[in-house]
A protein has these predicted regions:
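Glycine-rich, N-terminal phosphate-binding loop and its surrounding beta-alpha-beta segment
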Residues: 12-73, 78
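Ferredoxin-type iron-sulfur electron-transfer modules in oxidoreductases and energy-metabolism complexes
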Residues: 188-210, 228-322
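Active-site helix adjacent to the Tyr-X3-Lys
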Residues: 6, 217, 295, 299
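Single conserved hydrophobic/aromatic residue that forms the stacking wall/gate
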Residues: 1-7, 11
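Active-site-proximal helix-loop elements at catalytic-domain edges
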Residues: 27-41, 177-188, 248, 256-263
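Catalytic cores of enzyme domains
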Residues: 69, 74-214, 219-250
Length: 322
């Protein structure tokens, strides 16, 4: 949707002050907000004499559709699933995932900042509840899951049967574009390895991190970042417990009384990218915690992003091989 007030493209509840734009490739913020909101009221705690009640607030109980996600963002949701649906299950996230249906659009014109193919993602053929393609003004629709079938049944009066000739041609055209993008052939060699201490202790980090402003922009636009903080507010009528996004790039992230949080920006910078490219895939069957959406490439004020990190270590590896 085009938010007139914020003058940016975003995915949010449809309202009268918003215009639908199916041509936009990427929203400014990722659609993870639909399942992991930037801020949500989890509980209200109330005291009545000696009795205390705790009332959950954020449990989603209505079905909804997220329309227009791209393949990279769908993969981002899968990354979040591993975090929030593992043991112990996050019931607030679980409720949204159970009630939400994702309709993903193929990327008609991938942008230069996109590099999803590096992580095995096919922008031409998204894996969601429903995969869709817009071709010559027509919407081609393919349900892939039970949720997708249920949604298709609900809108069947708007649909007609079609062969896949145009869709297959569109897929090929998209893949041909992707092959020509500048970051498509980045190498992930050396990442997601059990023996990672050489990379952890590499002097490359000291050179890379210095332009970092610790603004946190990369973490807030990222579809896979899942760090959050918990805040309690006493309204006088009860204590509200909120969950809100946080950033591992902030100096007070995970601040505790005994002061064991990371003490330097270099350490925080290194942790962010080691988590994306090493720790997460080692603990999740090789799935990387980057999906190549390119938002950090576009939004970092210092042009310091995961592509630069990967390239820096590619160069270091080449120098060693020489």
């Amino acid at each position: 949707l085009c938010d007139r007030r914020q003058r940016q493209m975003c995915i949010r509840d449809r309202s009268e002050d918003a215009e639908v734009s199916l041509e936009t490739l990427k929203t400014v913020k990722s659609p993870k907000d639909a399942f992991f909101p930037q801020s949500e009221n989890l509980y209200i705690c109330k005291k009545d004499g000696k009795n205390i009640s705790i009332e959950p607030q954020a449990l989603k109980d209505q079905n909804f559709v997220v329309f227009g996600m791209r393949a990279c963002d769908v993969q981002g949701v899968k990354v979040l699933d591993n975090v929030f649906l593992g043991d112990p299950v996050d019931t607030f996230y679980q409720a949204r995932r159970e009630h939400g249906t994702i309709v993903a659009l193929a990327c008609h014109e991938p942008e230069e900042s996109c590099f999803c193919k590096v992580f095995g993602i096919d922008a031409a053929d998204p894996e969601a509840d429903v995969a869709a393609w817009i071709i010559e003004g027509e919407l081609f629709w393919k349900p892939l899951t039970e949720k997708g079938n249920a949604l298709t049944e609900a809108v069947k009066e708007l649909l007609a049967d079609s062969d896949e000739t145009k869709v297959e041609a569109e897929k090929k055209a998209i893949r041909d574009i992707i092959e020509l993008l500048p970051y498509t052939h980045l190498s992930l060699e050396g990442w997601a390895q059990e023996e990672y201490m050489d990379r952890f202790n590499s002097p490359v980090w000291e050179k890379l991190y210095k332009p970092c402003l610790a603004c946190g922009t990369c973490t807030f636009v990222c579809p896979t970042c899942q760090c959050y903080d918990i805040k309690d507010y006493d309204t006088g009528h009860g204590v509200h417990r909120y969950r809100c996004w946080d950033s591992c790039m902030y100096s007070d992230f995970t601040m505790m009384a005994h002061g064991n949080n990371r003490t330097s920006q270099m350490q925080r910078f290194r942790q962010r990218f080691m988590h994306k490219l090493v720790y997460y895939p080692l603990n999740n069957d090789g799935m990387f915690s980057c999906v190549g959406c390119g938002r950090c490439v576009e939004k970092c004020p210092e042009s310091l992003n995961i592509v630069k990190v990967i390239k820096a270590f590619e160069k270091q590896g080449g120098e060693k091989n020489e």
